[in-house]
Regions:
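N-terminal chloroplast transit peptides
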Residues: 4, 8-11, 15-21
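Basic, amphipathic alpha-helical/coil surface patches used to engage anionic, phosphate-bearing ligands
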Residues: 18-344
Length: 344
């Protein structure tokens, strides 16, 4: 499909999005206005053109799709273990390689390409250059967002909830080293794009922030455990993208294009699941094109929810997947604050 065809499809999809099927969805009347704005307004068409440019960039798509979704539970083969052992010998003076488990290095062995040693050396150099020191607590979400409060959009529907938040059972654990609650072995993270202000924080800072947390999620938090709901960590992440208060003004395709290639290359196979809600017709229209571009093994990791009952549906799905402790921690953190009674 050509770039022009994709853009045309995006515009048509927005104009006719009320006819598209939703999972568990009952569409609010405001979606008609959102679809019309996206399809006809100057700002809406500009944003869709940016999305189209992103989806039309073959090198970008090829750089993120091979190693985006998490691996299965297949044990390492003899050949893979031999390659890892050989790389360890060649990189015997590399601190990151020496401190990484075989499970961590296995992700790179399976990420494709020849010369595992060279690829491990490259990601080790990237880590030493990009990721801040582990003990630099300024990169904790709580501290980072407090220090940069003026660089995020005010969103009454979200109250004081931060742009990103690890889900932990006890509020007093927030900002510390305690491992987040696990969803099928993956650390659970909430992302709230309604707080995003495009351009307020540069891409390099975003990369350093996410990489600092990614190193913990894929390394330290994959080992050990401190209770029944925290056992079984496998070094992956599951996202809840709470789109409460979000609109086209918060969407930042340019930032995604800057961040995703580096993150998927240096944290391969790290996405376990992603829940995105509430979805309006504009997002669904974009997603209808995304599904044509990305392989099904990637899009299958995403669950899209909409309608007035999306919070209850998501909470119940999480309860069925990993129990009431995780579901009870998630429920007061998603949706408008006036509905949940929480601003934390």
């Amino acid at each position: 499909m050509t770039a022009g065809a994709r853009l045309t499809l995006l515009l048509l999809a927005c104009a006719h999005a009320l006819k598209l099927p939703f999972r568990r969805a009952s569409l609010p009347a405001s979606d008609k206005r959102a679809a019309a704005e996206a399809a006809t307004s100057t700002a809406g068409r500009k944003k869709l053109a940016q999305v189209n440019e992103l989806l039309s960039d073959g090198s970008f798509i090829d750089s993120i799709t091979p190693s985006l979704p998490s691996l299965g539970g297949d044990a390492a083969t003899k050949e893979e273990l031999a390659a890892i052992a050989a790389a360890r010998v060649e990189l015997s003076d590399d601190n990151w390689v020496a401190s990484s488990s075989d499970d961590v290095l296995l992700r790179f062995a399976r990420a494709g390409g020849d010369n595992l040693t060279a690829r491990l050396a490259a990601t080790s150099e990237w880590r030493s250059r990009v990721i801040p020191p582990t003990d630099d607590r300024a990169w904790e979400f709580e501290r980072f967002f407090a220090a940069n409060r003026d660089k995020f959009s005010d969103c009454p529907e979200l109250g004081q909830r931060p742009f990103m938040e690890w889900v932990r059972a006890r509020p007093e654990d927030d900002g510390g080293d305690a491992r987040p609650l696990q969803l099928e072995g993956s650390s659970l993270l909430i992302l709230r794009p309604g707080r995003h202000r495009i351009g307020a924080i540069d891409a390099e800072t975003w990369l350093r922030l996410i990489a600092w947390h990614g190193e913990r999620a894929t390394g330290a938090w994959a080992a050990g455990g401190d209770g029944p709901v925290s056992l079984g960590g496998d070094g992956t992440v599951s996202l809840i993208v709470d789109r409460t208060g979000s609109s086209l003004r918060n969407q930042d395709p340019a930032l995604l294009k800057e961040l995703l290639p580096a993150l998927t290359q240096n944290f391969p196979f790290s996405l376990h699941k992603a829940y995105v809600a509430p979805i309006n017709v504009v997002f669904w229209a974009i997603w209808s094109v995304v599904r044509l571009v990305l392989p099904s093994r990637v899009t299958a990791r995403f669950t899209l929810l909409s309608g007035d009952g999306w919070r209850a549906a998501l909470t119940e799905e999480i309860r069925e997947t990993c129990g009431s402790v995780v579901a009870s921690a998630v429920a007061p953190r998603i949706g408008p604050v006036e509905e949940t009674g929480s601003v934390a």
